[in-house]
């Protein structure tokens, strides 16, 4: 597996455990790309759902993917502050087609005051049965929910106070 290069524009593909496509983001600019970490940004990019419907993101977003963690984080810059959407997912993979991961349904929404809500537990339970997630997936995801909430409390990684603003400034250099 290679990794995307700084300044490169890539697609992001989200899959389900059974291999079906879940969602695709048309264009994300890579701000940092290594074997273990990818940071990207997009703004008003087209998103295609599995049923073919499309929509456009409303605000600039900084995307954080790590090869050692079972989650990715999207920091969305809004007037009221930075909101985060955290997807519990497989670590990312990258090939010539796109940056890819498997979405495992659970999400954490983090508000500008750093309070958060765990979302879609019912969807996770349903898909766990339908797609027959192995027990090890449940163990890994629970461990990563704990890890992610610890990062939120500690304002670590993508939740650090200046993280999103710093990477957004870098993104603006590529847009001009």
Swiss-Prot record:
EC top class, as a word: hydrolase
- Keyword Lipid metabolism present in the record's keywords: the answer is no
Q: Where does Mg(2+) 2 bind?
A: 105, 107, 120, 123
The GO molecular function terms of this record are: magnesium ion binding; nucleoside diphosphate phosphatase activity; ribonucleoside triphosphate phosphatase activity
Q: Give the active-site positions.
A: 23 (proton donor)
Instruction: Quickly give the catalysed reaction.
Output: a ribonucleoside 5'-triphosphate + H2O = a ribonucleoside 5'-diphosphate + phosphate + H(+); a ribonucleoside 5'-diphosphate + H2O = a ribonucleoside 5'-phosphate + phosphate + H(+)
InterPro entries per the record?
DUF402 (IPR007295), FomD-like_sf (IPR035930), Ntdp-like (IPR050212), SA1684 (IPR016882)
Could you say which EC number(s) this protein's record lists? 3.6.1.15, 3.6.1.6
Record keywords, A-Z: Hydrolase, Magnesium, Metal-binding
Q: Does the keyword Metal-binding apply?
A: yes
Which cofactors does it use?
Mg(2+)
What are the binding positions for Mg(2+) 1 in this chain? 87, 103, 107
Q: What task does this protein carry out?
A: Has nucleoside phosphatase activity towards nucleoside triphosphates and nucleoside diphosphates.
Which HAMAP family does this chain map to?
Answer: Ntdp (MF_01568)
Q: Which family does it belong to?
A: Belongs to the Ntdp family.
Q: What is this protein called?
A: Nucleoside triphosphate/diphosphate phosphatase
């Amino acid at each position: 597996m290679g990794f995307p290069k700084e300044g490169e524009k890539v697609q992001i593909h989200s899959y389900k455990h059974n291999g079906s496509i879940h969602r695709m983001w048309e264009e994300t600019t890579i701000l940092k790309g290594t074997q273990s970490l990818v940071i990207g940004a997009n703004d008003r990019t087209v998103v295609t759902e599995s049923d073919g419907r499309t929509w456009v993101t409303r605000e600039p977003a900084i995307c954080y993917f790590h090869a050692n963690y079972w989650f990715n984080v999207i920091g969305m810059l809004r007037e009221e502050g930075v909101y985060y959407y955290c997807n519990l997912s497989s670590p990312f993979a990258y090939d010539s087609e796109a940056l890819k991961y498997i979405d495992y349904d659970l999400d954490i929404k983090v508000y500008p005051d750093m309070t958060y809500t765990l979302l879609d537990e019912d969807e996770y339970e349903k898909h766990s049965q339908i797609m027959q997630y192995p027990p090890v997936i449940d163990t890994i995801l629970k461990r990563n929910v704990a890890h992610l909430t610890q990062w939120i409390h500690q304002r670590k990684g993508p939740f650090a106070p200046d993280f999103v603003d710093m990477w957004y400034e870098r993104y603006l250099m590529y847009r001009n």
